[in-house]
A protein has these predicted regions:
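Terminal (often C-terminal
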Residues: 15-96, 104, 117-118, 124, ...
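Glycine-rich strand-loop-strand elements at beta-sheet edges
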Residues: 68, 104, 109-138
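Beta-strand signatures of extracellular beta-sandwich domains
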Residues: 99-103, 144
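Short, intrinsically disordered N-terminal pre-domain segments
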Residues: 1-16, 174-175
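Hydrophobic core residues within well-ordered beta-strands of beta-rich domains
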Residues: 98, 129-131, 167
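Exposed regions on extracellular, virion, or secretory-pathway luminal proteins
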Residues: 2, 10, 79, 107-110, ...
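Extracellular beta-strand-rich recognition modules
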Residues: 80-90, 128-131, 141-149
Length: 175
């Protein structure tokens, strides 16, 4: 004899939903995740750190995205290990080095960087740098991205309205 259990949600004893089941019968756990993107051209001066400007939230399950301060905020509810990706498309990159540095605090150009990712000079006029990393964030951490380039003048990020993600910060909790 077969049994059928019909539910829309599986809840924790504390009352929060742990797993939602869609109309197709597939479950999607409410694992914390975020995607914040750029949608405007940003000028990056030569030889100084410049914070990535984020302009829109694509997905944000736990109010991570802080558009006012251009960062992702972590709390005691969302602390843990995340798989993160940062990416930016550049327009006419003329510098020898283009760097994206992921940091976990509000201190720019300090000792609080998770990792430095560098791109060499592009052979064409456009270059898309994309990097993925794991990091364990604590309750007071943030995720912000700083640019650095060593050209003789400013370079610009590239933003095409037809493309959904020219520049972005994303992550989801894995542990």
């Amino acid at each position: 004899m077969a049994s059928t259990l019909k539910v829309q949600n599986i809840a924790h004893t504390g009352g929060t939903n742990a797993i939602a089941i869609d109309s197709g019968g597939f479950s999607f756990d409410k694992r914390p995740h975020f995607i914040a993107k750029t949608n405007q051209v940003q000028s990056i001066p030569a030889s100084q750190y410049t914070q990535m400007q984020i302009h829109a939230s694509v997905a944000d399950t736990h109010n991570f995205i802080d558009l006012s301060n251009n960062r992702i905020n972590f709390s005691s509810d969302t602390a843990g290990t995340y798989l993160c990706t940062i990416s930016q498309k550049m327009n006419n990159l003329t510098s020898n080095r283009f760097m994206m540095a992921a940091r976990y605090s509000n201190t720019q150009n300090g000792n609080d960087y998770i990792a430095y990712f560098e791109e060499n000079r592009a052979e064409s006029s456009y270059s898309q740098a994309t990097y993925t990393f794991l990091y364990t964030f604590t309750a007071s951490n943030v995720l912000a991205v700083d640019y650095y380039q060593d050209g003789s003048g400013a370079v610009n990020t590239y933003t095409a309205t037809a493309a959904a993600l020219n520049g972005f910060i994303s992550g989801f909790k894995i542990g």
